[in-house]
């Protein structure tokens, strides 16, 4: 079973962002190719029975919701691709969505860590938690590498030099 891999999301996002304007791929199609991990988590939830079944089903629903949110982020990226590449309009909104996505990933990682002590699920959740944490770090790296509009100077616009 393949655990949630945030690097797939970043690969899709980067492919959309770096494509020439005339060849921007459809992020929904890319998401269908890459974002299968929510379904894998749902399958995991169906496989287990016992006391944790309801918790696992709740996690699977969260994963599906998370996958839908990521697809929405990709759709927003498609709509604003030229502005995002140039660092102008759309950047703040996209950055905000990515930050919320990273925050959700982090919270899910904490939840997975809390279930590690359960002997039956410990190894599975340890692996999922590690994937979530790695994904959160990758999202933060991506946010750090996004283009920024010009940084305003402290003393206002540049003044012409005096001779």
Residue ranges of model-derived segments:
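Non-heme di-metal
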Residues: 1-163
């Amino acid at each position: 079973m393949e655990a949630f891999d945030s690097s797939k999301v970043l690969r899709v996002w980067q492919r959309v962002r770096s494509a020439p304007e005339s060849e921007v791929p459809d992020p929904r199609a890319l998401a269908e190719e890459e974002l299968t991990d929510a379904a894998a988590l749902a399958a995991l939830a169906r496989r287990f029975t016992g006391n944790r079944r309801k918790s696992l089903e709740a996690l699977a629903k969260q994963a599906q919701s998370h996958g839908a949110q990521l697809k929405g982020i990709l759709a927003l990226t498609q709509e604003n691709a030229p502005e995002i590449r140039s660092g102008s309009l759309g950047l703040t909104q996209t950055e905000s969505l990515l930050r919320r996505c990273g925050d959700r990933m982090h919270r899910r990682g904490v939840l997975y860590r809390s279930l590690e002590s359960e002997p039956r699920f410990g190894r599975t959740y340890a692996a999922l938690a590690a994937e979530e944490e790695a994904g959160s770090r990758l999202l933060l790296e991506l946010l750090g590498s996004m283009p920024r509009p010009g940084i305003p100077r402290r003393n206002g616009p540049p003044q012409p030099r005096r001779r």
